[in-house]
């Protein structure tokens, strides 16, 4: 029954995406042009990759509000190292490890001090946003040495034919994460931890370790998204990652994951991320003022949470 319900939710999200594409195509035929649609998928990359980590977390019953700040901090760190002509591969690895370290800090704060994830990661969101500003001196960082721009790290911002390489990277990450979630013990443990933590502990699952792993993955993929952004843009603005956490959480919840834990899929998250990108791109094409765009995403997020709450109550009664 649960498998049928999960498939029904995924099918519903896919139908929403298809309906949006049809409506926007009717309103602005340019929306479905190959160039624009590839751009929509490319715009999904950063949100999508970060949402992979958030999916693991939300399934295990937690969330991370600091992902945008991790994106900004690791991006500024990598850009500073690039600017200093540090070996690009080493700079890349340092940034990814920094993301893992921040994720580890979040995980320890939540599991060992029992501070609610919302409060703990809200605190680290503010802390590491300040760190990002401190690293950059409040200035955007750009114009990197040729040894950096010619390296494989910056190739991530290029294209393979008409398709941006970052889209292939996102696809690989989603496929691997989907397999881990659906076919491995680690994935089972995350579902068990979020679905019924007491029962999970009774059968020998270390729920604290599962949650810490989720936070580490979230930090790592947020840092990776920042590296891809640098490679594509060739710069890091001072506002890098600001507000990104809301888009990421919205994508996961739209994709059918439950804020109460124990439910969600990578396919659903990908479709949710696509919906966010389609809506944002469509609003630009329809000349909707920028200040309404985030407001609309907020409304969509509230509706998704209300639907999740309704479905959770229905499941409990059933």
Model features per residue range: what roles?
Residues 1-20, 175, 195, 202-209, ...:
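Cytosolic-side transmembrane-helix boundaries in multi-pass membrane proteins
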Residues 2-5, 63, 101-142, 180-185, ...:
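Short loop segments and helix-boundary regions at transmembrane helix junctions
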Residues 10, 42-43, 88, 117, ...:
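Loop-to-transmembrane alpha-helix initiation sites
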Residues 22-84, 109-114, 256-266, 299:
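Single transmembrane alpha-helix segments in multi-pass membrane proteins
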Residues 29-39, 133-135, 180-187, 214-250, ...:
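Inter-helical junctions in multi-pass inner-membrane proteins, predominant
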Residues 87-95, 101-106, 110, 159-236:
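Helix-loop-helix "hairpin" substructures at the membrane interface of multi-pass membrane proteins
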Residues 117-184, 210-213, 233-241, 316-318:
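Transmembrane helix-bundle core of multi-pass membrane transporters
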Residues 222, 233-298:
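Transmembrane alpha-helical segments in multi-pass inner-membrane proteins
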């Amino acid at each position: 029954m649960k498998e049928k319900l999960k498939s029904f939710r995924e099918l519903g999200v896919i139908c929403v995406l298809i309906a949006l594409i049809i409506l926007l195509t009717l309103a602005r035929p340019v929306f479905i042009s190959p160039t624009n649609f590839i751009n929509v998928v490319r715009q999904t990359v950063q949100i999508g990759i970060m949402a992979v980590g958030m999916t693991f977390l939300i399934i295990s019953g937690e969330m991370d509000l600091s992902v945008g700040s991790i994106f900004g901090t690791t991006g500024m760190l990598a850009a500073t190292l690039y600017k200093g002509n540090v070996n690009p591969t080493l700079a890349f690895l340092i940034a990814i490890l920094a993301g893992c370290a921040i994720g580890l800090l979040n995980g320890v704060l939540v599991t060992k001090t029992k501070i609610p994830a919302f409060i703990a990661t809200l605190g680290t969101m503010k802390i590491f946003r300040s760190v990002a500003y401190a690293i950059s001196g409040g200035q955007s960082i750009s114009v990197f040495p040729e040894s950096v721009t010619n390296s494989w790290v910056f190739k991530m911002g290029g294209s393979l034919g008409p398709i941006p390489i970052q889209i292939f990277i996102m696809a690989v990450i989603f496929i691997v994460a989907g397999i881990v979630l659906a076919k491995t013990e680690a994935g089972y443990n995350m579902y068990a931890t979020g679905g019924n933590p007491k029962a999970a502990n009774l059968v020998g699952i270390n729920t604290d370790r599962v949650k810490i792993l989720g936070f580490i993955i979230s930090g790592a993929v947020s840092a990776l998204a920042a590296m891809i952004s640098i490679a594509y843009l060739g710069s890091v603005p001072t506002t890098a990652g600001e507000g990104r956490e809301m888009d990421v959480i919205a994508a996961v919840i739209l994709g059918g994951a439950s804020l109460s834990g124990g439910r969600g899929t990578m396919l659903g998250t990908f479709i949710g991320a696509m919906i966010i990108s389609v809506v944002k791109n469509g609003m630009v094409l329809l000349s909707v003022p920028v200040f309404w765009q985030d407001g609309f995403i907020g409304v969509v997020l509230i509706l998704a949470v209300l639907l999740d709450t309704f479905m959770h109550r229905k499941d409990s009664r059933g």
